[in-house]
């Protein structure tokens, strides 16, 4: 068996920048930043670029691929070093990383926020099922709730839990993934990825007419995680794959980036048929996996993103930023539009809203990471594989 690339390197220094960019696309989608810019820029190619990077779905899909890559890489390295996978320790590490902040946000959304709404003379009930969120099944709750919204025409899903569905899918992935590699013989590992990618594509094809299912359902997006995992597997087990990414030239990398971005920007023209949903996601997520692998292992990268220190530092707070930014956005909206009574349609007000929401989210994310998440992360380290 070939040796893994940079076997002792568990922290990938160039990925924190990408984490923040993925978060920012989600943030941009929730603040309508893309619409704000597109309405003021009348250059088609620029607007297409803005559209791609202001769609929350782009960032969420990238997060899935990144999680699949990192978790699979760590599991396979553990198997290489120790000859087994300690499933219990894996679960404990994931619980200590995900649950504390996740359940704090749930507490705020379902217990504290309703009282705030009453103070603001807004007594609309929260339509979501708290038990689905507590049990990490909120992606199915979102499907049901949005179906009701489509029938009634009333949109009242609290923005604070607008991202919980993706965390639920990640947790479902964490539950299943280590068991597969602990129980299935090593010689069959590559088939795990192939089978899951195939099943996910077939599921999307069968449900191609239902955009809610193809966007929120676990089976529809599991291929994202599997593709990230497959690239991690090949990074460790394929000498040919390793050498390709080590030796790929700058101009070749540039070509892939241009092609990948073009597909993302002009996908609606390239894939006009509704049947294309079955495989078009595989193409975009393979591009995301290429970016991750190229940044980690290429010796001729056009630029290593970890050199951009400020954004890289912000990337360390990404989990908190991702979960908390809806609260920051809502807080700023309440202050600007409910309390100060500013005009939502004015350009200056919209700029203040977007910039303030980002700053507030970063501040809350920093506080959360430093004073709330870090103690759990230190405890998590006790369950790392030695």
Language-model segments: residues:
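Membrane-interfacial alpha-helical segments at the cytosolic side of multi-pass membrane proteins
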Residues: 25-30, 69-73, 110-111, 171-186, ...
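Interfacial loop-to-helix transition and helix-capping segments at the boundaries
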Residues: 10-13, 49-60, 124, 128, ...
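Transmembrane alpha-helical segments and their boundary/interface "anchor" motifs
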Residues: 15, 57-60, 76-113, 123-133, ...
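Alpha-helical transmembrane segments of multi-pass integral membrane proteins
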Residues: 111, 225, 230, 253-374
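Solvent-exposed interhelical
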Residues: 171-198, 233-252, 345
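Aromatic-anchored segments of alpha-helical transmembrane domains
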Residues: 24-31, 111, 196-206, 258-269, ...
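Functionally critical transmembrane alpha-helices in membrane proteins and complexes, commonly lining
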Residues: 13-77, 99-101, 128, 137, ...
């Amino acid at each position: 068996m070939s040796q893994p690339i940079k076997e002792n390197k568990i922290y990938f220094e160039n990925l924190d920048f990408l984490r923040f960019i993925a978060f920012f696309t989600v943030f941009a989608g929730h603040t309508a930043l893309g619409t704000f810019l597109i309405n003021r820029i009348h250059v088609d190619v620029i607007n297409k670029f803005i559209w791609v990077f202001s769609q929350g779905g782009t960032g969420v899909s990238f997060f899935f691929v990144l999680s699949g890559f990192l978790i699979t890489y760590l599991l396979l390295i553990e198997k290489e070093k120790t000859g087994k996978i300690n499933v219990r320790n894996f679960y404990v590490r994931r619980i200590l990383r995900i649950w504390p902040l996740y359940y704090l946000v749930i507490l705020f959304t379902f217990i504290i926020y309703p009282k705030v709404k009453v103070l603001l003379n807004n007594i609309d009930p929260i339509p979501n099922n708290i038990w689905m969120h507590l049990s990490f099944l909120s992606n199915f709750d979102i499907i049901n709730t949005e179906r009701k919204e489509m029938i009634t025409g009333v949109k009242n899903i609290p923005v604070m839990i607008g991202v919980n569905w993706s965390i639920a899918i990640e947790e479902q992935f964490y539950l299943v993934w280590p068991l597969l590699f602990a129980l299935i013989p090593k010689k069959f590992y590559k088939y795990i990825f192939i089978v899951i990618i195939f099943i996910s594509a077939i599921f999307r094809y069968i449900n191609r007419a239902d955009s809610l299912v193809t966007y929120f359902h676990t089976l529809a997006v599991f291929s994202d995680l599997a593709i990230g995992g497959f690239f991690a597997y090949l990074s460790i087990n394929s000498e040919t794959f390793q050498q390709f990414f080590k030796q790929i030239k700058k101009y070749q990398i540039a070509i892939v980036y241009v092609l990948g971005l073009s597909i993302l920007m002009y996908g609606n023209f390239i894939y006009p048929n509704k049947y294309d949903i079955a495989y078009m996601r595989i193409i975009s997520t393979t591009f995301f996996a290429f970016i991750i692998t190229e940044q980690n292992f290429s010796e001729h990268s056009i630029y290593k993103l970890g050199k951009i220190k400020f954004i890289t530092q912000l990337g360390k707070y990404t989990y908190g930023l991702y979960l908390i930014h809806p609260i920051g956005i809502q807080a700023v909206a309440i202050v600007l539009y409910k309390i100060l009574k500013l005009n939502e349609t004015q350009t200056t007000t919209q700029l203040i809203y977007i910039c303030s929401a980002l700053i507030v989210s970063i501040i809350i994310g920093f506080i959360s990471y430093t004073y709330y998440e870090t103690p759990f992360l230190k405890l998590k380290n006790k369950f790392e594989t030695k």
